[in-house]
Amino acid sequence: MRQVIENWQRGFVLHRKAYSETSLLVELFTEETGRLTVLAKGARAKRSALKGILQPFTPLLLRWSGRSELKTLTKVEPAAIALPLQQTALYSGFYVNELLCRVLEPETGYPHLFQDYLRCLTGLASAEHLIEPSLRHFEFQLLQTLGYGVDFCHCAGSGELVDENMTYRYREEKGFIASLIKDNLTFYGRELLAFDARQFHDSATLQAAKRFTRIALKQYLGNKPLKSRELFTQYMLYQK
């Protein structure tokens, strides 16, 4: 079958695993093609330079070929030095990568999400206090990209504008409805307005945003637990 040679694309390694004795299967997130899997021939060989280049969080320039679902990597160059993710930021980066592996359709371009991903990694690498806001912002952008439409500014029951001092309960496929019930699905109006504006400036809003994104992402992730979350839990236990 005739091969198709792609142009250079910017991208990142999301995940990689051994394939045969000398090669790697590499899952990529690229600016134009989105998520795809490539075969990096000889990348595990002792003298291969690819082993050090094909690492998560390193901005790359990539080319590949092939018409089948599994492409063959033909060229790769580092576009910049690796983003310095360490400790909590590193595990957060693994979490973001796993999200993309789990929820994105293969070979579907998400150019705006690619920019959101780059901004998220930059935030994770910048300072510890930016980790949670960067994660929450990316999760909301990811949900929007997936077509998850929810109105944070209006009560789904009455259509009235959300009151920042009232509480609203989330109902899947409907939205937020004014309610006196307080449970895991209940949010203050001021939190909903902050979600809409992507403003995560205080700990209460960050916690509420994290609670909401876990609820919203569940329909895409299913019941299979995230490995990155389990690894982070183990890391935190070790730190104690």
UniProtKB/Swiss-Prot annotation:
Pfam families: RecO_C, RecO_N. GO terms for biological process: DNA recombination; double-strand break repair. The keyword Cell inner membrane does not apply. It comes from the Bacteria. Keywords: DNA damage, DNA recombination, DNA repair. One of its GO terms (cellular component) is bacterial nucleoid. Belongs to the RecO family. Involved in DNA repair and RecF pathway recombination. This is DNA repair protein RecO. It comes from Pasteurella multocida (strain Pm70). The gene is recO.
